[in-house]
């Protein structure tokens, strides 16, 4: 079966409801916590480490929920939301490759913030480069990621880790 190489917003919302590829597919967050508007390209081949990649985008506008509360008089997108978006994309990649279960962020080796996302920005771009994919009893992905705002790199994350779990009771 040939897998789809890009996804629009309505498909990502369907993923959050368990309707994209069924309930076993790892779901994305819904509503305000979905930090992705579209997946531009996803591939299990190529990339910087030869293990695959995913490129995605988020459109920025001054009405996004976080600008009203982070911070009053000094609106900026919380850096943790950009980091979470990268974890969301690693989990989505694992499901897209056939992994099943509930996605959980397992950590990150290093994160550097060198810029910010303001309400005047237009577009955030996510660049995720898979380094390792384990598809056994434990499904896990390790990736490096970058966040760019209007083409300028502002966050870099090394060794983003996401696992898929069929049972999260004792997680």
UniProtKB/Swiss-Prot annotation:
GO cellular component annotations of the record: cytoplasm
Reaction catalyzed: a (3R)-hydroxyacyl-[ACP] = a (2E)-enoyl-[ACP] + H2O; (3R)-hydroxydecanoyl-[ACP] = (2E)-decenoyl-[ACP] + H2O; (2E)-decenoyl-[ACP] = (3Z)-decenoyl-[ACP]
Pfam family, one: FabA
Cited CDD domains: FabA
Catalytic residues identified in the record: 70
Annotated metabolic or biological route of this protein: Lipid metabolism; fatty acid biosynthesis
Transmembrane segments: none
Main location: cytoplasm
Signal peptide coordinates: none
Alphabetical UniProt keywords: Cytoplasm, Fatty acid biosynthesis, Fatty acid metabolism, Isomerase, Lipid biosynthesis, Lipid metabolism, Lyase
Cell compartments where the protein resides: Cytoplasm
Record function comment: Necessary for the introduction of cis unsaturation into fatty acids. Catalyzes the dehydration of (3R)-3-hydroxydecanoyl-ACP to E-(2)-decenoyl-ACP and then its isomerization to Z-(3)-decenoyl-ACP. Can catalyze the dehydratase reaction for beta-hydroxyacyl-ACPs with saturated chain lengths up to 16:0, being most active on intermediate chain length.
Family designation: Belongs to the thioester dehydratase family. FabA subfamily.
Subunit structure comment from the entry: Homodimer.
UniProt-recorded name of the protein: 3-hydroxydecanoyl-[acyl-carrier-protein] dehydratase
Organism the protein comes from: Photobacterium profundum (strain SS9)
Gene for this chain: fabA
